[in-house]
Design a protein with these regions (language model features):
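PRPP-associated nucleotide enzymes
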Residues: 1-173
Length: 173
């Protein structure tokens, strides 16, 4: 429970910082004392998460972006050898709103090889082309960051709370 809550809390903190990069417009809002001018985001934000470990992180983002759409994909590793040194990725389930012109935040706590992130992103693309993509994680490896830089659009922003020195022989952080 403590781990899940802390992952959610990190999600809230990164979401707050990321919110500063969105586009806003000023709108009049009616309050009990009159009309106030407030800045509201104009981006159509969609939170994309790779199932299971990503759920508490997703919730942290949803606590900040409470009007965001929700997208989910199931992607997991398939080991191609007995030593678990060759890794493939399998994608099964996909549920997402239309992503055309959306600001897609792909939130997943760990970015190890980048393979699941890439396959999840490609699955999301079957539902539209986002205007902007942010890849967000709690911890990443240099290999995973480089993989995202090679396989995602050039203007993708990568957000991570920590960068690990590298992957072990089993491709784990």
């Amino acid at each position: 429970l403590l781990f899940r809550n802390n992952i959610m809390r990190v999600g809230e903190l990164i979401a707050y910082e990321l919110s500063k990069t969105l586009d806003y417009e000023e709108r009049d809002v009616q309050t009990p004392l009159g009309t106030a001018k407030v800045n509201v985001p104009t981006d159509k934000v969609v939170l994309g998460t790779i199932f299971r470990a990503g759920l508490p992180f997703h919730q942290g983002f949803l606590n900040i972006f409470d009007h965001a759409g929700n997208a989910f994909v199931s992607a997991y590793r398939e080991y191609e050898d007995d030593a678990h040194t060759k890794v493939g990725i399998h994608v099964e389930y996909l549920a997402t709103p239309d992503l055309n012109n959306a600001t897609l935040l792909i939130v997943d706590p760990m970015l190890a090889t980048g393979g699941s992130m890439e396959m999840g992103y490609k699955a999301f693309l079957t539902k539209g082309t986002p205007k902007r993509v942010h890849v967000v994680c709690v911890i990443a490896s240099p290999e995973g960051i480089e993989h995202v830089r090679r396989t995602f659009p050039e203007d993708t922003t990568i957000w991570c709370a920590a960068v690990d020195p590298g992957l072990n022989e089993h491709k784990y952080i």
